[in-house]
Regions:
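Short active-site oxyanion
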Residues: 36-37, 103-108, 188-189
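Zn-dependent metallo-beta-lactamase
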Residues: 2-13, 17-55, 62-64, 146-154, ...
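Portal/gating segments that form or line small-molecule/metal binding sites
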Residues: 116, 122-151
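Active-site-proximal loop/helix segment associated with metal-binding centers of metalloenzymes
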Residues: 149-188
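Active-site beta-strand termini and strand-to-loop segments that position acidic
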Residues: 48-51, 141-143, 181-185
């Protein structure tokens, strides 16, 4: 009986070892097939390079951000081509330079519906460069990349300098969202 248990234990150990080795090789092969690069831009801002070579930028408060790394603090063009621009809510430390990036690159800004609408209405963002997300809605803005808006508990107020009066105005900008971003290889990032 003892010999049988010893043999069974050895067989299970070998099977587990082979399984783990195979799993490790599979994970390494998947990683080699494409990696996701993540660069912190300060505050809640990130630049993501997908396995397919696309660039996603989230919450780009660059020129006003105290922790923005050089050269992005003084030159938003340093981001390179932005394929997807996401904003979680209208506070300046999140929306930051997003409208300027959208206009400079003719890239659509994706954000909560009640944030994008006043951006367009106030003339901050051209209508063709704003995409309104509903919470729990998802889109596939780029081939192989899926973005899902998820609930986030935070306020959202758009402060805009009115060019006619030179004064700041506050505008309600709906509820904040987070994003689950699924890359071409299935890897997911949850940004809140």
């Amino acid at each position: 009986m003892f010999q049988f248990q010893k043999t069974l234990s050895l067989a299970l150990t070998l099977t587990l070892g082979i399984f783990l080795a195979t799993t490790s090789v599979t994970a390494q092969a998947q990683a080699a097939a494409g990696k996701t690069e993540l660069l912190w831009l300060g505050q809640a801002g990130f630049k993501i390079k997908t396995p397919g070579g696309k660039t996603i930028v989230i919450d780009p408060w660059l020129t006003g951000g105290p922790k923005t790394p050089a050269p992005y603090k003084t030159d938003i063009a340093a981001l390179g081509k932005v394929d997807l621009l996401l904003v979680t809510h209208a506070h300046v430390d999140h929306i930051g330079d997003a409208p300027a990036i959208a206009k400079a690159q003719n890239t659509v800004l994706y954000g909560p519906a009640d944030m994008v609408t006043p951006l367009i209405t106030l003339g901050i963002l051209p209508a063709n460069l704003g995409h309104r997300f509903n919470k729990t809605g998802h889109v596939t803005p780029l081939p192989g990349i899926k973005v899902t808006a998820v609930q986030a508990e935070h306020s959202s107020l758009l402060v805009h300098n009115n060019p006619a009066t030179g004064k700041n105005e506050s505008h309600p900008a709906g509820e904040a969202v987070g994003y689950i971003i699924q890359m071409e290889n299935g890897f997911k990032i949850w940004h809140m």
